[in-house]
Amino acid sequence: LAEGHSPKLLVRSESIYKVPSVGDCELIIGDVNDKGAVKKTIEGVDAVIYTIGIIREFKSKDITYENLHFGGAVNAIDAAAESGVNRFILMSANGVCPDGTGYQKTKWMSEQYLKNTDSKWTIFRPSTIFGDPRGNGRPEFCSQLKKDLINLPLPAPLFHEGLVPFNAGNFSMSPVHIID
């Protein structure tokens, strides 16, 4: 915004109240699995930034890794190509691989799909995103996790393998602050 850009944001109707009023942003109400809403959001932009990531699924509501990490990314990548948008930035995740968890696999699949396009693409893989996104003193998940676990007298950094002191330092951390 400070550079004069006018972002368009695709926002689910049930999440509209979570979006702060930020001047020149155009809000499009819709779902990433609705190709029409995705296309409407992407028309007329210079670049697409895809940052969807869920940490748990709600299959009864079709909120799945497959639908959002991969299917939604494919819809956005395809809509960008159809609209002539040649710049695509994809937020993936640290530790993605084809044979990992559902989270890791679907993030990996979206990376592979994007890599096989003619777009000028950037993929970034944060391990955690931290900060106070709404400025209301309520930090999001990773900041709360830091407060509850890392600031303890005994740090607990090995979430994926439990507390195994011999494995300390054998994992990658790429934290990203919300301002970045």
Describe each PLM feature range:
Residues E3-H5, D99-D180:
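Oxidoreductase cofactor-interface core, primarily capturing Rossmann-like NAD(P)-dependent enzymes
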Residues H5-S13:
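Conserved glycine-rich Rossmann-like NAD(P)H-binding loop of the short-chain dehydrogenase/reductase
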Residues R12, A93, G131:
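Cofactor-binding loop segments of dinucleotide-utilizing enzymes, especially the Rossmann-like FAD-
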Residues I16-S83, N94-D99:
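NAD(P)H-binding glycine-rich loop region in Rossmannoid oxidoreductase-like domains
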Residues D34, G72-N75, R87, S110, ...:
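Conserved cofactor-binding/catalytic machinery of classical short-chain dehydrogenase/reductase
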Residues E66-A73, I89, K107, S174:
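Short alpha-helix in the Rossmann-fold core of NAD(P)-dependent oxidoreductases
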Residues E82-R87, D118-S119:
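A short helix->loop->beta-strand "cap" motif at the edges of active sites that frequently abuts
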